[in-house]
Amino acid sequence: MKGCKYGTHRVIEPKGSLPQPALKISNDMNIFSNEILIDVQALNVDSASFTQIEEEAGHDTKKIAAKILEIVGERGKMQNPVTGSGGMLIGTIEKIGEDLEGKIDLKVGDKIATLVSLSLTPLQIDEIIDIKPDIDRVEIKGKAILFESGIYAKLPTDMSETLALAALDVAGAPAQTAKLVKPGDSVLILGAAGKSGMMCCYEAKKRVGPTGRVVGLVRNEKSKAKLLEMGIVDDVIIASAQLPVEVLETSLAANNGNEYDISINCVNVENTEMSSILPIRNGGTVYFFSMATSFTKAALGAEGVGKDVDMIIGNGYTKGHAEITLQILRESEIVRTTFEKMYL
């Protein structure tokens, strides 16, 4: 039997919904003729989601595991009920539905990373083998289903699977940065020392050229030293992204008193909307990659301070995003080495 290419045939509650906003979907692993069955090796849980679960569990890995099993048991997918976000997975193609066989560039045995969110992916976990809180990674035995419309990336052969997965997990951020940033722009990146932040810093620095400026915002001296040593920013400021007035003052001071053309929010905590908006000039752009962003706070906040800025939701997908992101690891030895130290 053939299902809807967007996966609506698996929605249990509420009827008529798409799989991502649905409260519950079917994780029956008998596939429809236009679905793909994946033998799952690991989940890379979205940073905002993992942080929330970890704090709720008091940093106890057994409680984190129990919470993940509870969520998947209730929803049929790994979608954090607080943040609404999911993550991505890595696995091996186990079966391809007859309507897709020979029509896609996948075969049984191929290793892939899914580039659609776990928040819409039917998932069944048989066992949680290990949890790595430092890299938001959960190694499991289980199965998942990719819909006909689902996007994916075959894992590259010139780098380790874990390294590729760490980068692909945030593929939308550097790719959108590549589209948004122009030569001569001044760019403020919040959460610059994190995985997506470092990628965005590198891509922004490349795009602004010698006449532009990239400033990273981090939480501590250790992160500041790391970014400056990497050479992927022009300056680094230390401030809490949850304190917008502090961010405004320190960020403008780092840009010769001038407002920025673009800000990129890669922070994994709530209440950072105004820190992204205040330092930006009228007519500038604010890119919210963070899944902890509130549309209401951003929209009303910008209005409240009279800011006429373009605000972009951090769409995890943009054309060519996997290739752009993996290319950063290939062309930048310092980014690749840093990722290997942090995420392997």
Curated annotation (Swiss-Prot):
Keywords: NAD, NADP, Oxidoreductase. Pathway: Amino-acid degradation; L-lysine degradation via acetate pathway. It comes from the Bacteria. It is an enzyme of class 1 (oxidoreductase). InterPro entries: NAD(P)-bd_dom_sf. GO terms for biological process: L-lysine catabolic process to acetate. SUPFAM superfamilies: NAD(P)-binding Rossmann-fold domains. Coiled coil: none annotated. Its EC number is 1.4.1.11. It catalyses: (3S,5S)-3,5-diaminohexanoate + NAD(+) + H2O = (5S)-5-amino-3-oxohexanoate + NH4(+) + NADH + H(+). GO terms for molecular function: L-erythro-3,5-diaminohexanoate dehydrogenase activity. The keyword Manganese does not apply. Signal peptide: none annotated. Homodimer. Involved in the anaerobic fermentation of lysine. Catalyzes the oxidative deamination of L-erythro-3,5-diaminohexanoate (3,5-DAH) to 3-keto-5-aminohexanoate (KAH). Belongs to the KDD family. This is L-erythro-3,5-diaminohexanoate dehydrogenase. The gene is kdd.
